[in-house]
Amino acid sequence: MLALAKANSATYPEIDFVRADGTLLPFGDGSFDAAISAATLHHCEPAAAVSFLRELRRVARVAPIVGDLRRTPAAYGGARIIALLSRNRLTKNDAPLSVRRSYTPREAYELALEAGWRRPSVRPTAWFRLLLYDAA
């Protein structure tokens, strides 16, 4: 994946790609204006999620921003229907599992508090997603 990203951005030599553990990022405090995560949080067990969110807060000078799945009964039902209709093996197995492993807005808020976010805010968004950010 990194090789593809590098190839696609070859005309932008100022862009760097780094593979790293999200719970121990190799960047200094406040290295970025924002630290953005998309569709990652649901892959983390709660303890790892707290470590991950703590690292995002640490490296973000202004705000960490997390977009992820939002666990609801309707989201799980939709994922099951998609899995039943799909021919793709990954979709069949991953869609319902990802929804089951995702967090509710309240759970995401609590994880962010535990990670030391000063003023976490969670907003439900379309298609059973949520947006979590530190409004501090």
Each language-model region and where it sits:
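Conserved short alpha-helix immediately C-terminal to the canonical SAM/SAH-binding motif I
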Residues: M1
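Conserved SAM-binding loop
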Residues: A5-K6
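Conserved SAM-binding strand-loop segment of SAM-dependent methyltransferases
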Residues: T11-G28
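A conserved beta-strand element that flanks and buttresses the S-adenosyl-L-methionine
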Residues: I36-S37
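Hydrophobic adenine-recognition pocket in adenosine-nucleotide-binding enzymes
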Residues: T40
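A short, conserved alpha-helix within the catalytic core of class I
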Residues: C44-V59, V66
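C-terminal alpha-helical "lid/dimerization" subdomain adjacent to the S-adenosyl-L-methionine
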Residues: L69-S121
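C-terminal lobe and adjacent flexible extensions of AdoMet/dcAdoMet transferase-like proteins
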Residues: A126, L130-A136
